[in-house]
Structure formats: structure tokens, C-alpha cells
């Protein structure tokens, strides 16, 4: 029996493709390495809308900790559904936020705010988001920076190519909100 359930976008039938799927898999793999078998609920699975309520009831019956990593609509549904189930099962509910959109969604959904206040913890990627959620009255928020397992290169292994024009490489979606304009301006000034 698993101690922990992770409910998120696994894409169990294929290789994870987007940031949400990658983070869900990285988190689950890390938890599994430390705590053993994890019960996975794949929000992308075929028939997931039908199966997921039953899977989550099973998770509430058998797991002590339930971690969710939903997108926008999934959060609205899952937060309220799990909070309702938790009145019966009294489990530790956790929400690992992916991206920076949560503080924009919550003011439009006071019912989700109410549900998330009942979660044991909410893990956000930045201090800015933590501050925004604290302004909404949350005290169960902590910062867990985004991560990805990478091999550490030894000194001398990294190729040194410092020739103009300098190249810009990013590890995120290219959007103005993420500061790509500032980064591009700096590289253009250097070149």
C-alpha cells in the first residue's frame, strides 16, 4: 500500500512533454526514491474524468498524504472535491503549484480559496507568489523552487565558447512575463 498519492499530469502512456508533466514526474520520482511506492492518478489518462473520482476516493482510503498538481480547471474541481472527502478521511492534502497563475485565478473563485485554506500545505515556486497568497490570508504556503535533475559537470568539462555574437538560451516558455524581453535586451547590448 502506498503512503502517498500524487494526482497530476503524468502522461503514463508516453514521454512527458510539457513543464507540468515534467514537474509531476520529477516530484513523484523523488518522493518514490525516499518513501517507496507512490499511488499515481494521471489527469491526462483516457477516461480520467470518469475514473478519477473513484481513484481519489481509493487514495483517500489508503494514503496518508494526497498531493495534487492540477492546471486551472483541475484546481477548481479537485480542491473542492478533496476538501469534501477530507471531512470523512482526515488526510494531509498538499498542492504543488506549477507556474505563476494562481494568484490571478483565486480572486475569481472564493470557494477555491476556502478549500485551499484547509490544505496542509501549498508549495509555490517563487517568493513573489508566496507573498501574493499571504495577502489573500494563506498561512500554509512555502516556497519550493522549481527543479530538474541535471548532472553536474566537472571543471573543464563545460565547453567554453565566448565568441560574438553571444547566444541566448532559456529553459522556460518564452513570454514577456517571464522576463524574456529583458534577457534579449541584455544580450543585444552585449553584441
Segments (PLM) and residue ranges:
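Conserved donor-binding/catalytic core segment of Leloir-type glycosyltransferases
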Residues: 5, 160-178, 184-191
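An amphipathic, basic-hydrophobic alpha-helix
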Residues: 30, 43-89, 108-110
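A short, histidine- and acid-enriched strand-loop-helix "catalytic/donor-clamping" loop
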Residues: 71-75, 91-108, 121
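Nucleotide-sugar-dependent glycosyltransferase donor-binding/catalytic pocket residues
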Residues: 12, 16, 149, 173-176, ...
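Structural motif
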Residues: 65-67, 121, 167
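N-terminal subdomain of nucleotide-sugar transferases
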Residues: 1-44, 89-90
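A short beta-strand/loop micro-motif in the catalytic core of glycosyltransferases
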Residues: 118-127, 142
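Carbohydrate-associated surface elements
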Residues: 128, 147
Amino acid at each position: 500500500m502506498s503512503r502517498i498519492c500524487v494526482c497530476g499530469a503524468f502522461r503514463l502512456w508516453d514521454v512527458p512533454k510539457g513543464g507540468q508533466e515534467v514537474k509531476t514526474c520529477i516530484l513523484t520520482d523523488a518522493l518514490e526514491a525516499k518513501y517507496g511506492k507512490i499511488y499515481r492518478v494521471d489527469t491526462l489518462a483516457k477516461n480520467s474524468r470518469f475514473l478519477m473520482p473513484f481513484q481519489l476516493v481509493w487514495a483517500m482510503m489508503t494514503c496518508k498524504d494526497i498531493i495534487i498538481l492540477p492546471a486551472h480547471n483541475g484546481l477548481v474541481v479537485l480542491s473542492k472535491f478533496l476538501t469534501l472527502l477530507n471531512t470523512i478521511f482526515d488526510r494531509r492534502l498538499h498542492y504543488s503549484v506549477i507556474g505563476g497563475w494562481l494568484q490571478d485565478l483565486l480572486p475569481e473563485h472564493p470557494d477555491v480559496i476556502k478549500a485551499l485554506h484547509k490544505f496542509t500545505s501549498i508549495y509555490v515556486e517563487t517568493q513573489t507568489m508566496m507573498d501574493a497568497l499571504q495577502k489573500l490570508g494563506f498561512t500554509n504556503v512555502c516556497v519550493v523552487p522549481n527543479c530538474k535533475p541535471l548532472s553536474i559537470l566537472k571543471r573543464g568539462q563545460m565547453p567554453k565558447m565566448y565568441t560574438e555574437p553571444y547566444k541566448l538560451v532559456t529553459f522556460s516558455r518564452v513570454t514577456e512575463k517571464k522576463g524574456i524581453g529583458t534577457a534579449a535586451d541584455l544580450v543585444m547590448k552585449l553584441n
